């Protein structure tokens, strides 16, 4: 039973990655939890609006980093381990938005990708985190599984400099 009332929905408290581990560092951001992940926010980011122009983000100077990078230890599983354990026969759409750890997750999803039809993922190009991604980072796992770029479904432009910060991309077989 779950709080959403859907039999097919359940919550699991761990991270996905390229290996199964009992302990990995996860960095929590209290002010904006959606920015939390296995990579720390970069306090020296040159492109972050929240760091460099906090008033544009509706913040006071220093607020953004004040409660960032709070370290929490969590378990980590490969996507293949999770899908195998739950005996999931196929995946219509695999959605990844994991703050620059998408490539690590895909590395641990070789078997899962074979039974997945569509992958929708985010690519962060700028320096908000201590890691960013390129198309190569994800395509080295997607192309061998038969995926091709179908669409760049969203482009986020940085209002400070006009550069593309991140994109949502769709890959299909």
Language-model features: locations:
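Phosphate/nucleotide-binding beta-alpha loop and adjacent structural elements of enzyme active sites
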Residues: 1-173
């Amino acid at each position: 039973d779950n709080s959403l009332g859907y039999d097919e929905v359940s919550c699991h408290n761990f991270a996905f990655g390229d290996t199964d581990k009992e302990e990995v560092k996860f960095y929590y951001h209290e002010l904006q939890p959606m920015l939390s992940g296995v990579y720390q926010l970069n306090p020296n980011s040159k492109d972050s609006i929240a760091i460099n122009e906090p008033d544009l983000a509706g913040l006071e100077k220093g607020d953004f980093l004040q409660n960032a990078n709070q370290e929490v230890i969590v378990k980590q599983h490969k996507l293949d381990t999770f899908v195998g354990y739950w005996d999931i026969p196929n995946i219509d759409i695999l959605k990844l938005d994991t703050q620059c750890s998408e490539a690590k997750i895909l590395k641990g999803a070789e078997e899962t990708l074979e039974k997945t039809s569509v992958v929708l993922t985010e690519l962060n190009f700028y320096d908000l985190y201590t890691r960013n991604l390129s198309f190569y980072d994800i395509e080295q796992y997607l192309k061998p599984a038969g995926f091709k770029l179908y669409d760049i479904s969203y482009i986020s432009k940085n209002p400070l400099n006009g550069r593309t910060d991140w994109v949502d991309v769709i890959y299909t077989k």
